[in-house]
Amino acid sequence: MRVFKDAISGDEMFSDSHSPQLINDVVYEVDANFITVSNGLDSKLIAANPSGEEGQEEVSDSTERVIDLVHASRLVSTSFDKKSYRAYLKGYLKAIKERLQKENPERVSIFESRINEYMVNVFKNFDDYEHYIGESMNPDGMVALMNFRENGVTPYFVFLKDGLIEEKY
């Protein structure tokens, strides 16, 4: 199994169980699904017998519909307007560029040109995206973008390839 972590915060962003697709060698688009999770206790897991005097004891249980990738990686929803996202992205891309200059200098020009091409389309449809950050909520870390596929039902996330560290387990 491969886990992709934010290179700055170290937060897990996604794993290969979500079948990431590398787009133009610059971003991963990762499809996700809605799932229902239980927020309560399963009474079968409690090691006790129901009281004979009081009838059946109930355990309150609630369910919630969540996106599996958000739930599994413990991503946190955040919000940006276009102006604040541009400011964040400028600083984040600078940090990625500095990292690439140290670790993989020949990748810098490819990264710069391709990320600019991709982000032009993001900004054209900026209001369609939701924003998620890693579990540590590090303000310098990656902000993943979430939108829906053309069917309007399937959520997908966008992660910058060069902002990730891949670990194999």
Curated annotation (Swiss-Prot):
PROSITE patterns (alphabetical): TCTP_1 (PS01002), TCTP_2 (PS01003), TCTP_3 (PS51797)
Compartment(s) of residence: Cytoplasm
Record protein name field: Translationally-controlled tumor protein homolog
InterPro entries noted in UniProt: Mss4-like_sf (IPR011057), Mss4/transl-control_tumour (IPR011323), TCTP (IPR034737), Translation_control_tumour_CS (IPR018103), Translational_control_tumour_p (IPR018105)
Family: Belongs to the TCTP family.
MF (Gene Ontology): calcium ion binding
A single cellular component GO annotation: cytoplasm
Chain's role: Involved in calcium binding and microtubule stabilization.
Record domain TCTP: where: 1-169
Segments traversing the membrane: none
Keywords per UniProt: Calcium, Cytoplasm
